[in-house]
């Protein structure tokens, strides 16, 4: 999308890791999001994608596997939310890679302000993945097999406190499922502009994505605020907790 070209880093996080699927994204240069859990067959699939698509200039690593793939293929490296960068020591471990990073979404802004390294990205917008499931909940609930799969889209899980979570499928060499908080983290209108922002647009429509990016671009440029549509079930996450 044209509006995405205004961002510093564009990350593609496909539901299906397949060269043909990724080829449909009309973007000249981007980072590939690397899942946090990979078996050898998954690594082989991602290696094939990294080799075939020259538009991939970097990887967003959510585990050590992503870091090593960046090194093997000489790609730029972004330490994503899955790396849980919690303090300056965590950042220092990777200084030789010259990489960018996302601050842990378990940190408050007070804790982030204590970092000596101020160049990280604050997770400012989007639904947070709480867990990756290697087993198949569809097989368990629907009593089906892979060759007679009964997956027909996202399913909803409710815990004992009646909190709702989406279960979304991600396919690499096999199916994985992500447990996603339905309360969208949203800091727009509350956070100051002197930061780098990580915006997770997954699950948004093209129009919602455009308005979200435009709003944050307006915020950092000091222009007129372009209000994001008010959404239900938003949260501040840990960002405004009074801990330090």
Question: Predicted regions span which residues?
Answer:
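Active-site pocket-lining/capping segments in soluble small-molecule metabolic enzymes
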Residues: 1-244
